[in-house]
Amino acid sequence: EQAKALFHKMKDKILDKFQELEFKQRKKYAGFYSKRDGSAICTIEATKSKLKLIYSTSKKDLIPKSNFVQDVSKIGHWGIGNYRSEIKNDNDIEQAIPLIGKVYSDKIS
């Protein structure tokens, strides 16, 4: 239930902030894609208690590694991208939105 509520909050927040994105449900994850060219911006994998948000970029300087962001390029994972944040609460959602914005800005430029 917690992850489901977080998922809906995250989905709504992303779609409200970035109107040029569309949501697509895949078998193992959900994704947000550019309406213009179909490129992935981020994907979300839900577990029982948290969300795994994958930023759809391989650019090391775009999403800085931190306690909130880990490099998963050498770890098996669902989703598209090399950087992941675990979303466990509303504060994590707020922290992730600017990072999604960086990927979005990079993809549309």
Predicted regions and their residues:
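Short, conserved beta-strand/beta-arch hydrophobic-aromatic motifs that form part
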Residues: 24-83
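Well-ordered alpha/beta subsegment
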Residues: 74-109
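Surface segments flanking catalytic/ligand-binding clefts of nucleic-acid enzymes
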Residues: 9-24
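Solvent-exposed, charged helical/coil patches
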Residues: 1-10
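Intrinsically disordered, low-complexity segments enriched in polar/charged small residues
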Residues: 16, 27-31, 89
